């Protein structure tokens, strides 16, 4: 079988690298460069500059050259202090380094008085232009979530950044882009969608740090927009033969077991993670009561890091993920068609090998990656139901390489990425039973020729991309990130596009920063259903009666401007954006079946305003907090330009509010950890004003209850989660040997309708109040 061949290829690739590795340092994650200046602006040569991790206290040093320039390679993402001292002068700043960032800093020495630095630990006022609209998600933030929220990446980050909206089928929409959540694993982007109905995803528990980018970002991030989650995974190089075992149990049959362990030798690092989970409310059900909604799955992850001395460093990763879950039903389904029990299975295997070599002014890196994934829908049976079977497989093989050169005020990065994709799809759909049910209930339904749609196809293709970008510092106050990207896509259709990107940031004084950006994006058709969505299957729908062309690539112009500034212990920011998209895509759910296809529309327009506040300066006192607010509007414009739809009105010109349009979205959180007693607690809140619905009463694809619908939008919602716990069996600065925690999700038991998109898709309901208990046993270093 194809997947077995690809699996063997991945294991052989990783085995060769692991056997040839004799290691110590991880692959380079970021570069920090800068210049040391005297108070009069002259360069300070041959002086020590120290970079110290705030979280670990680890310090590394380098010296400035004859022009005062310095550089730190292989910088792990996180918060640091950067300091220097010379002949009665000193300076120190604090800054946050993002994954794969090239950060430019100017250090200006200040007079030292009584051996005390005048400016101590201030937050660096000038952020990089790497991703101005981004949120850094640390391992502490991930572990602060309940275990149930860490089952999937979308659930873990949906409240982390402004502009993220919950949608139908547990999707996360970002700034008006549907299911635009694109994880990158150590610099490698795969094509599968991270949501549970599309793929097995990646476990949030392997995240060391992630940069959640919702606006503009450099050209290296490629054919993506909406939301890029740039993940740096955990490494044994940051662990001293330590780990832990976590056991979680709670209401709705939610149970999980997670374990991890990692460590390092003088020239070698290792890390392993594994988890299994199950739930009786796996997907958001079409009824307040979850019926036929059991799901189970697991994740496995192994990472080997090593150093080849002067030849560079290596990283090898193997991942295995899978889930099996039911398709939820309603009480009316149980009454009228008790045998209609569909289920879905996802499986995924991934291998990544990365190499990196750094010198004082240059970094070279390369990655090779492979993945096999499968999604299989097992059909419901019995009368009055659509009989829908579907299987999709995707084989991915690719490689990428880049070189970063530091030259004065410039950091120039050049890269190339080539990927080969081999999708395989089979669909067997019999609509007759559901048509009979619709006629029995007197609800709208389609007319499909012979009541059947069948498809069987496989294809090979891929994409080759190249980019150039320059992160340049213009004086002491202005930075710019300027880049251009070329993409050549060839799978079902062929398209070439050039994407320019410009991001600038200006320090206006007193710690305040103004930023602005223009980004042009090119995004190929989604890989899920890429073949069947291009097969002209709409000709079998009598209301449409014609074969639509394939889904078209999306192109977009995005404009953004904003500002941020300190306000007491807070860092506050405000951002405005406007997006103009051609051929935006949207999912189509087949009637009475969890088969997802895509359609591209004529164009879309989205605009909004986002506000955020972070309480990070009090972290050393055990206090953290954040607040996000988004005001947005999203319009889609007919007619459909390609793909598969079931509603004929989308073939006529017109404008409509997109299903992911939510006027007001608010999220926030606060936590406190008392170091002396070990007690900790926190709360998080979420508000949404409601997304549009295209109908005012039930039309029952899963036979939803009519009294739960109504209005042009689903009702707004406000929910709150609370948690409390204690760390026990502590010794000095070591992690506690035992941690106990209680979580209450949806504390007020506000069971709300998340989304109701159209007459052919069921609504989905949130979780009720659910209580869970977690115990974690930490393995102490030897």
Locations of regions flagged by a protein language model:
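Periplasm-facing N-terminal accessory domains of Gram-negative outer-membrane beta-barrel systems
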Residues: 23-132, 148, 191, 205
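Outer membrane beta-barrel strand-and-loop segments of large Gram-negative receptors
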Residues: 58, 301, 396-402, 454-455, ...
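Periplasmic N-terminal accessory/gating domains of Gram-negative outer-membrane beta-barrel systems
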Residues: 89-105, 116-218, 223, 228, ...
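Transmembrane beta-barrel wall of Gram-negative outer-membrane proteins
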Residues: 249-278, 288-325, 343-363, 406-408, ...
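Face-selective signature of the C-terminal outer-membrane beta-barrel domain
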Residues: 307-323, 345-492
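Surface-exposed extracellular loop regions of Gram-negative outer-membrane beta-barrel proteins
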Residues: 324, 329-332, 376, 429, ...
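Gram-negative outer-membrane beta-barrel transporters
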Residues: 473-477, 576-580, 597-697
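C-terminal beta-signal and adjacent terminal beta-strands/loops
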Residues: 686-700, 719, 726-782
């Amino acid at each position: 079988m194809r997947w077995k061949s690809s699996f063997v290829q991945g294991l052989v690739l990783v085995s060769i690298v692991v056997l040839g590795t004799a290691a110590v340092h991880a692959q380079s994650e970021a570069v920090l460069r800068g210049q040391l200046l005297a108070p009069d602006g002259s360069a300070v040569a041959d002086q020590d500059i120290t970079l110290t991790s705030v979280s670990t206290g680890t310090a590394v040093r380098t010296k400035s050259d004859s022009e005062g320039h310095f550089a730190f390679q292989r910088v792990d993402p996180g918060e640091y202090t950067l300091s220097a001292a010379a002949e009665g002068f000193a300076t120190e700043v604090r800054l946050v380094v993002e994954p794969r960032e090239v950060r430019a800093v100017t250090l200006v020495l200040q007079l030292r008085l009584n051996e005390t630095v005048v400016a101590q630990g201030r937050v660096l006022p000038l952020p990089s232009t790497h991703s101005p609209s981004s949120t850094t998600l640390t391992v502490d933030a991930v572990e602060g979530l309940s275990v149930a929220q860490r089952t999937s990446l979308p659930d873990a980050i949906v409240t982390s950044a402004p502009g993220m909206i919950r949608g139908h089928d547990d999707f996360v929409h970002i700034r008006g882009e549907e299911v635009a959540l694109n994880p990158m694993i150590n610099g490698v982007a795969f094509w599968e969608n991270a949501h549970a109905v599309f793929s097995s995803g990646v476990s949030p528990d392997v995240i060391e740090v992630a940069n959640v980018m919702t606006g503009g970002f450099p050209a290296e991030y490629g054919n993506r927009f909406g939301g890029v989650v740039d993940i740096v995974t955990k490494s044994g190089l940051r662990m001293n033969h330590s780990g832990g075992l976590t056991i979680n149990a709670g209401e709705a049959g939610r149970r999980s077991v997670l374990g991890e362990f990692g460590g390092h030798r003088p020239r070698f690092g290792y890390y392993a993670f594994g988890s299994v989970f199950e739930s009786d409310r796996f997907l958001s059900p079409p009824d307040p009561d979850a019926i036929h909604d059991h799901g189970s799955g697991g994740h496995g992850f192994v990472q080997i890091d090593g150093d080849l001395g002067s030849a560079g460093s290596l990283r090898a990763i193997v991942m295995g993920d899978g889930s099996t879950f039911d398709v939820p039903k309603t009480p009316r389904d149980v009454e009228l068609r008790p045998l209609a029990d569909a289920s879905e299975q996802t499986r995924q295997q991934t291998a990544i090998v990365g190499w990196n070599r750094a010198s004082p002014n240059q970094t070279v890196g390369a990655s090779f990656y492979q993945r096999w994934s499968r999604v299989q829908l097992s059909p419901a049976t019995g009368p009055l139901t659509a009989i829908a079977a579907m299987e999709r497989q995707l084989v991915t093989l690719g490689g990428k390489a880049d070189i970063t050169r530091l030259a004065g005020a410039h950091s120039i990065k050049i890269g190339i990425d080539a990927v080969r994709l081999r999708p395989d799809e089979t669909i067997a759909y019999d609509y007759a039973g559901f048509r009979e049910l619709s006629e029995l209930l007197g609800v709208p339904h389609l007319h499909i020729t012979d009541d059947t749609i069948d498809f069987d196809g496989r294809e090979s293709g891929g994409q080759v991309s190249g980019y150039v970008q320059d992160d340049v510092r213009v004086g002491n106050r202005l930075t710019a990130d300027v880049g251009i990207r070329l993409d050549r896509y060839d799978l079902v259709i062929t398209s070439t596009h050039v994407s320019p990107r410009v991001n600038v940031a200006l320090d206006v004084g007193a710690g305040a920063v103004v930023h602005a950006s223009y980004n042009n994006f090119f995004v190929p058709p989604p890989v899920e259903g890429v073949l069947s969505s291009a097969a002209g299957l709409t000709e079998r729908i009598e209301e449409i009666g014609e074969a639509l062309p394939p889904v078209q690539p999306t192109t977009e112009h995005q404009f953004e401007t904003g500002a941020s500034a300190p306000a007491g212990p807070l860092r506050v920011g405000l951002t405005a954006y406007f997006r103009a998209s051609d051929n935006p895509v949207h999912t189509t759910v087949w009637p009475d079946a969890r088969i997802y296809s895509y359609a591209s529309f004529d164009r879309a327009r989205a605009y909004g305003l986002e506000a955020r506040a972070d309480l990070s300066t009090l972290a050393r006192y055990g206090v953290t907090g954040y607040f996000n607010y988004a005001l947005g509007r999203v319009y889609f414009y007919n007619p459909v330009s390609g793909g598969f739809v079931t509603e004929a009105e989308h073939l006529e010109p017109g404008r409509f509010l997109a299903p992911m349009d939510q006027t007001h979205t608010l999220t926030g959180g606060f936590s406190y950890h008392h170091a002396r007693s070990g007690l900790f607690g926190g709360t998080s809140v979420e508000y949404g004003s409601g997304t549009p619905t295209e109908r005012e009463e039930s039309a029952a694809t899963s036979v939803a209850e009519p009294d739960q619908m109504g209005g042009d939008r689903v009702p707004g919602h406000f929910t709150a989660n609370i948690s409390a716990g204690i760390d026990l069996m502590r010794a000095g600065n070591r992690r506690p040997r035992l941690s106990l925690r209680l979580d209450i999700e949806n504390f007020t038991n506000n069971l709300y309708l998340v989304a109701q998109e159209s007459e052919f898709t069921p609504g989905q309901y949130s979780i009720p109040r659910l209580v869970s208990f977690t115990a974690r046993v930490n393995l102490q270093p030897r």
